[in-house]
Amino acid sequence: MKNTIIRATAICVTAAMLCSAAGCSRIAGETAGSTEQISDNAAKTGSVIFSRESSFYEQEFVLELSTDTENGIIRYTLDGSDPTDGSPEYAAGITIKDRTGEENLLSNQAAGTLGQGGGFGSGGGMPGNRPGGFQVPRPEGSNLSMEQGNDPKGADTDSNEPKPANTDSEQRGPGNGGGRGPRGGSLSAEPAENVFKGTVVKAAVFSAEGDILSHISVKSYFVSQNIMSRYGSLPVVSVVTDSSNLFDEATGIYANYSQSGSDWERPVYFELFEPDGTLVVSQNMGVRINGGTTRSLAQKALRFYAKDSYDKENPTIEYEIFDGLTKSCNDDILATFKRIILRSSGNDNSGTLFRDALMQELVSDLNVDTQAARPCVAFVNGEFLGIYNIRERYDDHYFANHYDIDGDRVTVLEIASGNSTPEVSEGEESDLEYYEEMWNFFNDHSMADESSYQKALEYVDIDNLMDYHIANIYSANTDWPANNNVFWRYRTENGGYDGGAEWYKDGRYRWIIKDMDWGFGLMSDQTNDTLSHALNESSSGRRGNGFTSSQSTLIFRRLLENQGFQAGFINRFCDVMNTNYNAGTVAEAISNWKSEIEPAIDEQANRYPGSVPGRESWETAVDKMVRFAQERAGYMEGYLQERFSLSNVVDVTLFTDSEAGFIRINDTDITEETKGVSDASSWSGRYFAGTAQRLRAEAKDGHGFVKFVVTDLAEGTTVEYRDPAIEVTLGSAGTKVEAVFE
């Protein structure tokens, strides 16, 4: 599976207008102008030349604009709106300076001001209670009023790309049209103080008659003496857009945050900066509000779409956003994306701000798909928007990219909100028929019968299902399995299992990790018996503080009837706790995430007072995760022991010359490339006495295997084995194993 290295990034997003004129091409840093401004015969051959590129600057400077268009008039805006023939005419240099202390323009909208979504204020307000005449304040250089928002410039009118209604795989927000505040109430998110600001400039060339002669050029500038260190290794996200795309009462996606689907997608211009200010991605894209019930939070998540209808030269994002991310089917670096998400940490938005990202990172090398993550900070129209995690998005494009397959042959199903049956997220409604066939098979057959178990192996990837359950159970994720239960398959030519195909194209179901925000101590602590939660046999969609049901647990319960699967699951659980969930490994990963976002915590708390933690409560939330990591394994050992009537826990110690070779225990290579293994020459793991462990010696080039020397510490007996692959039953006091190479 893929190996993800997490690293911070900067993004800048700018709302752009689509160009429907034939032959319209993108110029770097430019957006297409409003088609209403272009006469039928006008050719957009001109361009605006900026004296400075988008970046971070430590000192203020004078920005100069020029054009090579004869008699061309440059007009510009500084608020994210598109220049028109009524915008200020450029006559002299524009001072780009540190804007510290300037009044907020967009950030000071209190909850409920916009009815459904409350703008940057929160989810307050109910439909039908919208106050009229709301205006977003405009700085010098602005020309667009909110009244113009009923026909927002930049609406996606590209008829070449179909727009099916409501194709979002996420749950809808509360209600069909309106919204409510998070956790049932209105929540103001007006910043405690003025937020840090950059400057965004949009400029275009016009004729004396008012025709637009160029694309709209966009630049973002961040000026501060400490800008290079202000956010540490974090990047910057700047969203520059016509504010009507966000706040218009009828069409704004913030004002109507519970709406979903392509009708609620708005055009943007997207720029991605690395932490040193280097611009690495800049292109036209679309944006929607992302998420389910978290849409009503003050800090909303955003989802970005790369399409040729927005940018013909850049229909995909071509950049290695996630350093070291490889495809799921091979070791190729993944540097092409159709969709990305700026996630505000979901239910953890008032906790650590990285909980789900961390938990997915911890298991990204297991037999499960995960969403790569990279923390960043975001701005909108130059104003600080908050800490976000850049994430991959699960959809047909994700699987097409990760597995080099046709996305149209991908089926993604999801069990959500305590429902007993899944819904189709990607694919066709007829894809449910194969799921029903599989579910009925498990419902009607006991896996204690070996022939039934072998048939079950044609429906599900057993290695994947084990790792998937281990990740959710260990993490104490109770927002599952009757919610956030997502699985996919490749639709084969014969419609079912194809044993002769590559493993990822064989037609079996595979589960993916999604939205684990309730885990690692958010909604329950390290003592939670999530194993019992995952084996619930009641029909209810809820079990205490969580989602589970007999329907959602059926497959796992049935598989555990098979003694071979049960033994493999127990050993695999121990393998993963000894490596991926090694307490020291997890604590280090938590520390890395904490260090990355720490520079922006105070600004985050200022931006969303009362809803996002201040530094002290944030550090407390992070410390709680560390404590979870330190104590969880002990509780899980007890739950496994009780459920499966296991003996005591003992140490298995493996010794070898790591320069000559390594030992594999079950399916885990004890090498220093494996998570949780710091010393491959002398490694110890915890397993249950009386269980059988598979061991295999692997010699490195230039070396050969000689023998295993196995010592039962309770009996004091030593046995030598010449076979490089053996099975050892653990003694009651532990077992010591040495692999000898030559």
PLM feature spans:
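Bacterial N-terminal signal peptides that target proteins for export
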Residues: 1-9
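Short, surface-exposed secondary-structure junctions/capping segments
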Residues: 101-115, 232-240, 296-310, 408, ...
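Short strand-loop junctions, especially beta-strand C-caps/beta-turns
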Residues: 79, 343-347, 558
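Short, compositionally stereotyped local motifs that mark structural "simplifiers"
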Residues: 11, 15, 21, 26-267, ...
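Middle-to-C-terminal accessory/interaction subdomains
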Residues: 118, 233-235, 244-260, 269, ...
